[in-house]
Amino acid sequence: MAKEKFERKKPHVNIGTIGHVDHGKTTLTAAITAVLAKQGKAQARAYDQIDAAPEERERGITISTSHVEYETDNRHYAHVDCPGHADYVKNMITGAAQMDGAILVVSAADGPMPQTREHILLSRQVGVPYIVVFLNKCDMVDDEELLELVEMEVRDLLSEYDFPGDEVPVIKGSALKALEGDPQWEEKIIELMNAVDEYIPTPQREIDKPFMMPIEDVFSITGRGTVATGRVERGTLKVGDAVEIVGLADEPKSTTVTGVEMFRKLLDQAEAGDNIGALLRGVSRDEVERGQVLAKPGSITPHTKFKAQVYVLTKEEGGRHTPFFSNYRPQFYFRTTDVTGIITLPEGVEMVMPGDNVEMTVELIAPIAIEEGTKFSIREGGRTVGAGSVSEIIE
């Protein structure tokens, strides 16, 4: 059978199910595909298919993730679901599955549980911008007042982590009953998808963001000048554009791009995803190096101190065998280069064990172009021992 061509007629949005173990995340994922399949907008995926998530490697970390896709009238969705709690932590921190919004699944019979809280915190820390709530297992709760109580608890919890708890859509349903084809509960899945359609905005596409390219290599062409090469991470670049070289120096350096080429051919415009060489006017070979970024002027600034949410690899994942303490000095790998940094643990945290997920403050010995949400690896002697996401810039 010929492969269907991927038609991009609708805006694309990345979402995922989050929440406590056994509250019904995977059942809900299956129910969404089943209900939308009846409208011809998805392929129904059985619970077992989703639950048997394949292992993937992201930054040297093994993560099990299931990917399903489906459509609504307005959009095309890519949806991630993880079998285990640790997979969520790793997924969100490494950015393996960048979510534009999440469906928080809470069992109405149990109310918010520890991982409910942890997933909300993680969403806040790694920059998941919007959350829609699905109160699951409502068929098991006869008491309307109890449902309202659980809803209030969830809203309060969201507000506690700076999500707009009062405005977040909360849909009461039963994923299992919907999956079994009960029309009353299928309706709730449609209601949920309408809420996701309306409440989670279409994300800005990478190509529409301000230009940035991490520099991978630099060389000089006699008589023409200095060329920086790399893969455009976001935005577009045209000949004649002003750019800044940011990072590894206290002040960004301004220059103009006098040529853009790709596969040795000259290009009018490079865009997100292209591997290019950019010819830089008036820049000598020693003024630009791997680890810096080329960026639209003023769009990103160099920093040395920040807070980050970090997942520390277990020894089975090839990480450390022993804990580390404040003042630990590993290498922080941002995009294309390592920079040494000093870690300060939060008050009351004595040490960090392999397998932990922790917030920490980092001070780099050289400034790097970073912003909230920038991902990095922590390395020690060339091996990855942690993965992190910048949650707050300090200086």
UniProtKB/Swiss-Prot annotation:
GO cellular component, one term: cytosol
Keyword Magnesium found: yes
EC primary class: hydrolase
Region: G1, residue numbers: 19-26
Residue segments, region G2: 60-64
Region described as G4: spans on this chain: 136-139
Domain (tr-type G): residue spans on this chain: 10-204
Subcellular location: Cytoplasm
Binding positions for Mg(2+) per the UniProt entry: T26
G5: annotated span: 174-176
Signal peptide coordinates: none
Domain of life according to the entry: Bacteria
Pfam families the record matches: GTP_EFTU (PF00009), GTP_EFTU_D2 (PF03144), GTP_EFTU_D3 (PF03143)
SUPFAM superfamilies, per the entry: EF-Tu/eEF-1alpha/eIF2-gamma C-terminal domain, P-loop containing nucleoside triphosphate hydrolases, Translation proteins
Keyword Hydrolase among UniProt keywords: yes
Keywords attached to this entry: Cytoplasm, Elongation factor, GTP-binding, Hydrolase, Magnesium, Metal-binding, Nucleotide-binding, Protein biosynthesis
Chain spans, region G3: 81-84
Catalytic reaction(s) noted: GTP + H2O = GDP + phosphate + H(+)
GO molecular function: GTP binding; GTPase activity; translation elongation factor activity
Chief location of this protein within or outside the cell: cytoplasm
Role according to the record: GTP hydrolase that promotes the GTP-dependent binding of aminoacyl-tRNA to the A-site of ribosomes during protein biosynthesis.
Family classification: Belongs to the TRAFAC class translation factor GTPase superfamily. Classic translation factor GTPase family. EF-Tu/EF-1A subfamily.
Subunit-structure text: Monomer.
Protein name: Elongation factor Tu
Provenance organism: Geobacillus sp. (strain WCH70)
